[in-house]
Amino acid sequence: MQPESGANGTVIAEFILLGLLEAPGLQPVVFVLFLFAYLVTVGGNLSILAAVLVEPKLHSPMYFFLGNLSVLDVGCISVTVPSMLSRLLSRKRAVPCGACLTQLFFFHLFVGVDCFLLTAMAYDRFLAICRPLTYSTRMSQTVQRMLVAASWACAFTNALTHTVAMSTLNFCGPNEVNHFYCDLPQLFQLSCSSTQLNELLLFAVGFIMAGTPMALIVISYIHVAAAVLRIRSVEGRKKAFSTCGSHLTVVAMFYGSGIFNYMRLGSTKLSDKDKAVGIFNTVINPMVNPIIYRFRNPEVQSAIWRMLTGRRSLA
């Protein structure tokens, strides 16, 4: 990100994040709501992570991935919300260019890992339901760790690519970002150099990072649905759909908000709808994920309850 001298000769070395609302009287309300959402998200995801670590019944591939997903949700919301809360308290909206790039990198890192991890979870469900005889071999601990490591490596490459590409753009004014965190669409609109290459890169990498995993998820669940429909036991079908239903809900929310946010860069003006989608990406998704997995999964519910009450598992 290369700051340049603007028309008045000043050098742009920082961005002004306008936040969610301009009305000063509503800032305390925004602060309380987002602080509450942050605490609920961190508490909910850490409770699932703790349950996965200490509960023997949850020492399986599906819950291994769920524990990793909880870490990602905490990371995703921690990249954006604490800094926003700090600005609300200090009433200082200026963010240095370097800090903006750092936030951009880590946000896309966590979101990218999330993308691949959801695919790994779909593959796990496919093996468990469609290939039960070879499940333990194909989804061994080594395979699980390799899938997680590959997810981090691919996401790191993606985040670094966008961050480096963004750093090559020139910014000579204005420097007001109509958002509460630094992200690609908003920064593209402030650049005084061409962003065509950056947007093409976003679409190309986005197809690889989102399109391919989404296709793999759809294919996996087509096979899963066909296998579940062949199960004669009503209880067996119910159990299969309960574990898959939670994951499908999270996938729909994650990809739905992501596609809306990044696949409409041709818009000449970003509106408050983009802020709403930003809230969905950074706050709502990480907050509701543990709720979805907890309330739609009896094993997670009982594990968290035993952990809170100090009871030991019978396993």
UniProtKB/Swiss-Prot annotation:
It is found in: Cell membrane. Residues 1-28, 83-103, 162-199, 265-275 are extracellular. It comes from the Eukaryota. It holds the Pfam family 7tm_4. Odorant receptor. Coiled coil: none annotated. Residues 53-60, 124-143, 224-240, 296-315 are cytoplasmic. The keyword Phosphoprotein does not apply. InterPro entries: GPCR_Rhodpsn, GPCR_Rhodpsn_7TM, Olfact_rcpt. It is a multi-pass membrane protein. This is Olfactory receptor 3A1. Disulfide bonds join C100-C192. Belongs to the G-protein coupled receptor 1 family. The chain crosses the membrane at residues 29-52, 61-82, 104-123, 144-161, 200-223, 241-264, 276-295. One of its GO terms (cellular component) is plasma membrane. The lineage of its organism: Eukaryota, Metazoa, Chordata, Craniata, Vertebrata. One of its GO terms (molecular function) is G protein-coupled receptor activity.
